[in-house]
Every structure is written in structure tokens, then in C-alpha cells.
């Protein structure tokens, strides 16, 4: 999987998540009653790092490839869902869809558990 397109896409998305996390942190620091943005920022920043780390572990052959990819994509998709919902609530006054943030949070938990399984599962033989 070394240098695969999917890995590069995940890393690129994680970079965008990181940038968005910093933007939301700044908005939270300078905006009135913007606590939701701080939570959105944290989720994006933490899980951008988690996605990059997971890809690195896959590339090194430390964790199961397929399960690790599920975890990495889960980090990206779920953190984006969570942060988008909180940001919409802050600026637009409504949610992305009912239970969007809790759904994103639940998917983040599942992604962390998938990473644990990927680490425990034997490496695939090439």
C-alpha cells in the first residue's frame, strides 16, 4: 500500500481537517458564546492526527490493512460529521440532521475500536 492513492487522499483530508480545526479554534477564541466551535475544533484536530497516524501504521505494516483503513476513513468522516453539525448549529441555528453530532461521536468511538482490532489482528501476509 506504500504511497497508495487512498493513503494520500486520507492524508490530504486530514490536512484539511487540521486547517479547519485551527480556523474553528480561532473563531471559538474570538467569538461570543462559541463553545460549540471549540468542541468542533478539538474533534477535527485530534482525529486528523488519528487518521494520519493510522495511515502511517498501515504503511509500516503494524496493523491490519483493511480494518485500519476502515478506522482511518471513520476518523475522517465521523469527525467531519460531528464538527459540521456543531458549526451549523453555531452559525445557522440548526443541525445538519437530527442526531448528527451523536452519530458522528458514535462513529468515532467505533473507529477507535476498529483501530484496536486492527492492532490486535495478525498482519496480512503479502
Regions found by a protein language model. Give the residues of each.
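Polytopic transmembrane helical bundles with strong interfacial aromatic enrichment
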Residues: 1-126
Amino acid at each position: 500500500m506504500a504511497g497508495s492513492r487512498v493513503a494520500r487522499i486520507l492524508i490530504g483530508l486530514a490536512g484539511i481537517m487540521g486547517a479547519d480545526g485551527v480556523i474553528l479554534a480561532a473563531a471559538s477564541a474570538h467569538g461570543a458564546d462559541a463553545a460549540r466551535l471549540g468542541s468542533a475544533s478539538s474533534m477535527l484536530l485530534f482525529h486528523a492526527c488519528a487518521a494520519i497516524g493510522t495511515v502511517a501504521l498501515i504503511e509500516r505494516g503494524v496493523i491490519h490493512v483493511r480494518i485500519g483503513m476502515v478506522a482511518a476513513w471513520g476518523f475522517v468522516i465521523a469527525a467531519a460529521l460531528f464538527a459540521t453539525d456543531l458549526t451549523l448549529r453555531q452559525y445557522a441555528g440548526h443541525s445538519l440532521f437530527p442526531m448528527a453530532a451523536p452519530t458522528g461521536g458514535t462513529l468515532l468511538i467505533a473507529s477507535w475500536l476498529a483501530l484496536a482490532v486492527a492492532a490486535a489482528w495478525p498482519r496480512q501476509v503479502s
